Amino acid sequence: MKKYIVFAIIPFLFACSSSTLNDDYDEAFAKDTQGLDILTGQFSHNIDQIWGVNELLVASRKDYVKYTDNFYTRSHISFDEGSIMIETLGDKSRLYHSIIHTLLMGADAKGIDLFTSGDVPISSRPFLVGLVVDHKGKQVKNIATASNFANYLLQNKLQTRYLTNGNPVQYVIIPMVANHVAVRAQRYLPLIRKAAGRYGIDESLILGIMQTESSFNPYAISYANAIGLMQVVPHTAGRDVFRLKGLNGQPSKKYLFNPAKNIDTGVAYLTLLRDKYLDGITNPTSKRFAMISAYNSGAGAVLRVFHNDRDIAINKINRLYPEQVYRILTTMHPSEQARNYLLKVDKAQKSYRVIKNSESDLP
């Protein structure tokens, strides 16, 4: 893991609390985000003042970042790299405290405020169980085990780096288990299978998209206001799915940080792409490639790669072999992100061989 990473401020992150009629609807989205420039500006200012301008580290799709101790201590979980870095500008006692709270934090993203510097609550069902083992190879499930592990880390694995202003930063790095991605994926497999059955979407496609979108990070957020495991954007895909379900408005952040609801919404959107926006593509493999690309860039952008007229674009796709559709979308889509997205999801999907009624087959 890199010792420090620079991220652009995420323009939405966890918005100020809004008053909505219920947890499912967030029609006050505009009001909910009016004060975010001030909020994110202050957040950035706090970090700049304490850590320095080149040390801005914030949460993203595949990175959990939480500040504590008035921003003097922070925890960073890289879900891609499978590594946890906990560092402080304070003394070892702060590091010790943060190690324990990070190891024992819960999986409920709604209960963790990434915009404050308060402690993360200790959970009786820690998220990192199964993903991290201590120096004796044991699971870290309670305060006693976490405390012993923290003491071991401080005595044997403590490292120091220096900021540009010369201030020392003490830190420890905790590796996740080698198969950490598969462990996280398996946790959500029952929910994935439920959604796959409900909407008729291949389980391996859902897994491939989730791995590419968030690396199965339940705390995932992004600069594009995408939320949760399947990175659903509330006011676009979320609103479309609510309309499909006969609901008004759009899903709230709390709604989308619920894994079951997030997965259901993401998979429902895939069915909209398949049955509505990309309807007319006859070859199932060609349609799958188009669906994957459209999940990232939108169906309109995908069709315009072939022609500005929708019907002509569909006809062109239908005259091509799936391999040709794949090549065009991965080389000629105007968005580099979309080109790479199809490559990544297709590769990830191939790595999953999900067998019905079994949960032990993930790679």
UniProtKB/Swiss-Prot annotation:
<dbReference type="InterPro" id="IPR023664">
    <property type="entry name" value="Murein_transglycosylaseC"/>
</dbReference>
<keyword id="KW-0449">Lipoprotein</keyword>
<dbReference type="InterPro" id="IPR008258">
    <property type="entry name" value="Transglycosylase_SLT_dom_1"/>
</dbReference>
<keyword id="KW-0998">Cell outer membrane</keyword>
<keyword id="KW-0961">Cell wall biogenesis/degradation</keyword>
<dbReference type="GO" id="GO:0016798">
    <property type="term" value="F:hydrolase activity, acting on glycosyl bonds"/>
</dbReference>
<dbReference type="InterPro" id="IPR000189">
    <property type="entry name" value="Transglyc_AS"/>
</dbReference>
<keyword id="KW-0564">Palmitate</keyword>
<dbReference type="GO" id="GO:0009279">
    <property type="term" value="C:cell outer membrane"/>
</dbReference>
<feature type="signal peptide">
    <location>
        <begin position="1"/>
        <end position="15"/>
    </location>
</feature>
<dbReference type="InterPro" id="IPR024570">
    <property type="entry name" value="Murein_transglycosylaseC_N"/>
</dbReference>
<keyword id="KW-0732">Signal</keyword>
<feature type="lipid moiety-binding region" description="N-palmitoyl cysteine">
    <location>
        <position position="16"/>
    </location>
</feature>
<keyword id="KW-0456">Lyase</keyword>
<feature type="lipid moiety-binding region" description="S-diacylglycerol cysteine">
    <location>
        <position position="16"/>
    </location>
</feature>
<dbReference type="GO" id="GO:0016998">
    <property type="term" value="P:cell wall macromolecule catabolic process"/>
</dbReference>
<dbReference type="GO" id="GO:0008933">
    <property type="term" value="F:peptidoglycan lytic transglycosylase activity"/>
</dbReference>
<dbReference type="GO" id="GO:0071555">
    <property type="term" value="P:cell wall organization"/>
</dbReference>
<dbReference type="InterPro" id="IPR023346">
    <property type="entry name" value="Lysozyme-like_dom_sf"/>
</dbReference>
<dbReference type="GO" id="GO:0000270">
    <property type="term" value="P:peptidoglycan metabolic process"/>
</dbReference>
<comment type="function">
    <text>Murein-degrading enzyme. May play a role in recycling of muropeptides during cell elongation and/or cell division.</text>
</comment>
<protein>
    <recommendedName>
        <fullName>Membrane-bound lytic murein transglycosylase C</fullName>
        <ecNumber>4.2.2.n1</ecNumber>
    </recommendedName>
</protein>
<dbReference type="Pfam" id="PF11873">
    <property type="entry name" value="Mltc_N"/>
</dbReference>
<keyword id="KW-0472">Membrane</keyword>
<comment type="similarity">
    <text>Belongs to the transglycosylase Slt family.</text>
</comment>
<dbReference type="Pfam" id="PF01464">
    <property type="entry name" value="SLT"/>
</dbReference>
